[in-house]
């Protein structure tokens, strides 16, 4: 379930997301909240669930402030993630509450983490213990990776342990809901190279968790991850550009060599190319994980850690009781000098013991623990991680105290004795923890860790004890407060007796067990409150990288939107152009058809008009010809009549002869008229044939002209469309180049900002280290005069003792010499011996003065030499880290330039390919247009030839028919000969 995009953090409109949260008051359900750790989002608390009667861990996450939206989205992601995953080796999700601007994420309570164990025990784990923890962790990772999820923050601080020796994977605030991912997130020392370079080189997969697991194995084996002596920011650069880390060489006299399976397991987990690493399933099947081991390995490890925590807390309690008792006794005696000496002696022993452990190791261990807690999101709420400074101070302080008391006997003898009942009570196995100085001032309750029962006894659960057990515990607490496993805070010592008993019963009922001492928790809080530390720097750096990634995503979305808008615009332009051209084609073709129809109609009308005119002319000529023939007929008839009359023929014969003459004349007249009519008809037909041929030729020319115009229109439209496509290609090219330039400018700006942040962080780290070293040297310089005075006093004391011894010896020697010399020489001898004695004492004084000067000079030179060596080592270390940073920045800058060059080349190739394809398409369409023009012309020529052939055939058939029929009227049945031909 992806986080919803909300207008205001804390306001939920999606019912599916609202179902994840409860608006009830969590303070009414959970009681006895006590802080047990700090995370990057807030604090983690132990609490008691009154409804379900069980102990839980509550992670309070505030989502107010400048980054409220980002915090709220992260909360939604983590809550949604935990609500969807269920696995025996993943911390159980209980509930989630919203109270004002704080989210209460309730999960199962675990007693500590794997990091707590190595910090408390102050040594690495054995292989069998590492394998047991990794086996259950890999089981959880297999489940996550099968869901295409990436944890992205695997480390010992996020591998929790329950009181039943079950490993629980926690802290999903950095988890990714998709695989692959592309976000810079995680703890620096455990981040895979591809995660560090996520924004520069692309995405990463679930193999990033395998790298973190390999680093975690080294952490469990060596107490701290590789490169931990470096600045956290410098570690990022080192991981990104150097070879993978390996196990450090070990002293075989103290522990056995690492097995080949373990070395190979880490080697396969820490392959720099992600594809060469094992998957979670392959890791789980590795011989190192699958080899046999005792079933109670983790339980025994937890028990040893609990015992150590108990000893450390008891030591803190003893130290506080002794300091309080000594202050009271020295105040009564009023011996200010002795009190100062005793206090100096006590703290001096402690300081010496801690100094033997090594200041650098202690401070680095403290930073490791605090860094673990700060980088985690408070996972499971459970013990986020451990600060080892308290553990180291406690252990060394304990051993140092014993040694110190034997080495400073004179000081110890001046101390008043500590009552035996106090020593006996504080050494009882059931004694609980006592808060350190900070915890007393803050009135924080510290609860002891109850020893884990033996295998024969049932494993304690988080269920409350019975009433009988509670009553017996109350009685014990009332009878002997120092012999209980629970100790009330200082402020509770003044509570009413009944209230104290109720509080003790409540605390006993909750069974608060942890693998961390109270001093560790207090120091973790102090580390968290420091300003400008590496945690804040890393947080700012992560936010910067994530902000850059978010800005890039938004830019890519905007570019995609611009490209889509341009595509829609170009498609719309093409569609509009196509529609316009289709309409234009239809209009042109309609106009051409109309013109053809008009021309055909004009041809028909012209033919009809010509026929009508010609017929009228023929009729007129026929009338004239008939009249002429009639005149000729009359003339011939009169001539014949005159001729016959001249013959004086009988009337009947005359009449018969006249009839024959008239008949002959009529036949001649009719024959001539018929011939003339045939002539006129032939002339008309010839005229019609000429007209039709001429009009058909004109019509064909018109059709060819119109067809050429149609092809020209199509060609013009094609050229216009090609111009539009070229313009759109240029628009697309300009937009892509603009986007690429903006992207490159943004990446360069991001890189410069990132480099500035990295350089500023390195400078701050350098300044902080130099300031700390200067403070340390200043402290040593301020401490040196007191140390020199003490040693000078010791030398002078030795001098006085030697002088006293020599004086006694001189007196004895003088007495002996006086007794053996005469009395008159005694005075002279005494004077000479006294003079010799004075010279010896003066020489001895000179020697002691020289010894003091030499001691002061040696100490000063030695201190200065130490300080110079420390300054030189620190300068070399910081210079090396700065060089690595510069090299890393040069590499990233070169990588970016190479990437920019590749992207520009790729874009130019894409643009060139598109341009070539467009030009090829234009050429092909033009060739198709030319081919279409040629084919159309051929088709028109063929059609016109066929039409002319049909017309001639029609003329032939019509002419033969007319001649055969003879009596058909002119023009009848021939008016549609052109249409028939077409």
Curated annotation (Swiss-Prot):
It is found in: Cytoplasm, Cytoskeleton; Cytoplasm, Cell cortex. Its cofactor is Mg(2+). The active site is at 153 (proton acceptor). ATP binds at residues 36-44, 59. This is Serine/threonine-protein kinase SULU. GO terms for biological process: feeding behavior; MAPK cascade; neuron projection morphogenesis; regulation of MAPK cascade; regulation of meiosis I; regulation of nematode pharyngeal pumping. It is an enzyme of class 2 (transferase). Residues 30-289 form the Protein kinase domain. Residues 421-431, 759-768, 973-982 have a biased composition (Polar residues). Keywords: ATP-binding, Cytoplasm, Cytoskeleton, Kinase, Magnesium, Metal-binding, Nucleotide-binding, Serine/threonine-protein kinase, Transferase. It catalyses: L-seryl-[protein] + ATP = O-phospho-L-seryl-[protein] + ADP + H(+); L-threonyl-[protein] + ATP = O-phospho-L-threonyl-[protein] + ADP + H(+). It comes from Caenorhabditis elegans. Residues 331-484, 592-620, 751-789, 957-982 are annotated as: Disordered.
């Amino acid at each position: 379930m992806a986080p919803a995009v909300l207008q205001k953090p804390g306001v939920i409109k999606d019912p599916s997301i609202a179902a994840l949260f409860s608006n009830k008051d969590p303070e009414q359900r959970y009681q006895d909240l006590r802080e047990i750790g700090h995370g990057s989002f807030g604090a983690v608390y132990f609490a008691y669930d009154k409804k379900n009667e069980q102990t839980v861990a509550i992670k309070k996450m505030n989502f107010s402030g400048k980054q409220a939206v980002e915090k709220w989205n992260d909360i939604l992601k983590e809550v949604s993630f935990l609500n969807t995953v269920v696995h025996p080796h993943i911390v159980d999700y209980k509930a989630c509450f919203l109270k004002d601007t704080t989210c209460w994420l309730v999960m199962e309570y675990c007693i500590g983490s794997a990091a707590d164990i190595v910090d408390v025990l102050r040594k690495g784990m054995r292989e069998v213990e590492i394998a047991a923890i990794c086996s259950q962790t890999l089981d959880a990772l297999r489940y996550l990776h099968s869901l295409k999820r990436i944890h992205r923050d695997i480390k010992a601080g996020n591998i929790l342990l329950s009181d039943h020796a079950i490993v629980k994977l926690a802290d999903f605030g950095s988890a990714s809901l998709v695989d692959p991912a592309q976000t810079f997130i995680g703890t620096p020392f455990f981040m895979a190279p591809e995660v560090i370079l996520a924004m520069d080189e692309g995405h990463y997969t679930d193999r990033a968790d395998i790298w973190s697991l390999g680093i975690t194995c080294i952490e469990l084996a060596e107490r701290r991850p590789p490169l931990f002596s470096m600045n956290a920011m410098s570690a990022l650069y080192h991981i990104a550009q150097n070879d993978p880390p390996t196990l450090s060489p070990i002293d075989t006299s103290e522990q056995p060599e690492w097995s080949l399976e373990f070395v190979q397991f880490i080697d396969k987990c820490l392959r720099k190319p992600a594809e060469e690493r094992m998957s979670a399933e392959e890791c789980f099947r590795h011989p190192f994980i699958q080899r046999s081991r005792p079933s109670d390995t983790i339980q025994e490890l937890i028990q040893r850690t609990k015992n150590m925590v108990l000893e450390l807390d008891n030591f803190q309690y003893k130290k506080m009781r002794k300091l309080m008792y000594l202050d009271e006794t020295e105040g009564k005696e009023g011996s200010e000098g002795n009190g100062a000496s005793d206090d100096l002696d006590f703290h001096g022993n402690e300081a010496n013991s801690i100094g033997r452990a090594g200041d650098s190791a202690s401070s680095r261990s403290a930073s490791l623990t605090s860094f673990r807690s700060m980088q985690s999101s408070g996972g499971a709420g459970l013990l986020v991680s451990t600060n080892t400074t308290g553990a180291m101070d406690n252990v060394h302080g304990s051993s140092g105290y014993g040694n110190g008391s034997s080495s400073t006997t004179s000081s110890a003898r001046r101390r008043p004795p500590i009552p035996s009942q106090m020593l006996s009570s504080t050494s009882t196995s059931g004694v609980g923890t006592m808060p350190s100085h900070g915890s007393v001032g803050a009135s924080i309750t510290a609860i002891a860790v109850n020893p884990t029962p033996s295998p024969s006894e049932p494993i304690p659960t988080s269920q409350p004890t019975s009433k009988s057990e509670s009553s017996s515990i109350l009685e014990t607490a009332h009878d002997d407060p120092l012999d209980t496993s629970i100790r009330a805070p200082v402020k509770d010592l003044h509570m009413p007796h009944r209230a104290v008993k109720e509080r003790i019963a409540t605390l006993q009922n909750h069974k608060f067990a942890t693998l961390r001492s109270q001093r560790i928790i207090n120091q973790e809080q102090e580390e968290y409150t420091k300003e400008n530390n590496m945690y804040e720097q890393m947080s700012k750096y992560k936010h910067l990288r994530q902000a850059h990634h978010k800005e890039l995503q938004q830019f890519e979305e905007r570019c995609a939107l611009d490209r889509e808008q341009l595509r829609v615009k170009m498609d719309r332009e093409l569609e509009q152009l196509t529609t316009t051209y289709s309409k234009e084609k239809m209009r042109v073709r309609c106009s051409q058809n109309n013109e053809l129809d008009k021309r055909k109609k004009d041809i028909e009308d012209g033919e009809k008009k010509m026929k009508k005119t010609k017929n009228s002319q023929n009729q007129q000529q026929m009338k004239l010809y008939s009249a002429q023939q009639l005149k000729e007929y009359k003339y011939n008839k009169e001539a014949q009549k005159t001729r016959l009359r001249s013959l004086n023929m009988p009337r009947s014969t005359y009449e018969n002869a006249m009839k024959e003459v008239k008949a002959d004349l009529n036949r001649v007249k009719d024959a001539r008229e018929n011939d003339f009519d045939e002539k006129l008809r032939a002339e008309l037909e010839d005229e019609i044939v000429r007209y039709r041929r001429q009009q058909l030729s004109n019509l064909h020319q018109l059709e060819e002209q119109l067809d050429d115009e149609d092809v020209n229109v199509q060609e013009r439209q094609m050229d216009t469309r090609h111009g539009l496509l070229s313009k759109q290609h240029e628009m697309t090219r300009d937009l892509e180049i603009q986007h690429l330039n903006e992207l490159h400018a943004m990446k360069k700006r991001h890189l410069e900002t990132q480099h500035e942040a990295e350089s500023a962080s390195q400078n701050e780290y350098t300044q902080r280290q130099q300031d700390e070293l200067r403070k340390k040297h200043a402290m040593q310089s301020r401490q040196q005069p007191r140390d020199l005075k003490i040693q000078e006093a010791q030398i002078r004391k030795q001098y006085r003792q030697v002088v006293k011894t020599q004086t006694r010896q001189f007196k004895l020697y003088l007495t002996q010499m006086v007794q053996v010399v005469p009395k008159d020489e005694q005075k002279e001898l005494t004077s000479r011996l006294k003079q010799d004695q004075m010279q010896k004492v003066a020489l001895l004084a000179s020697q002691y003065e020289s010894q003091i000067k030499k001691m002061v000079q040696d100490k000063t030179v030695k201190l200065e030499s130490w300080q110079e060596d420390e300054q030189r080592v620190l300068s070399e270390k910081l210079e090396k880290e700065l060089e690595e940073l510069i090299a890393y920045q040069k590499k990233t800058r070169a990588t970016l330039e190479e990437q920019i060059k590749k992207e520009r080349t790729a874009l130019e190739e894409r643009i060139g390919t598109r341009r070539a394809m467009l030009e090829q398409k234009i050429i092909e369409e033009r060739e198709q247009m030319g081919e279409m023009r040629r084919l159309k012309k051929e088709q028109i020529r063929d059609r016109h030839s066929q039409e002319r052939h049909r017309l001639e055939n029609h003329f032939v058939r019509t002419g033969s028919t007319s001649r055969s029929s003879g009596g058909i009227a002119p023009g009848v049945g021939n008016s549609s000969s052109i249409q028939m031909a077409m």
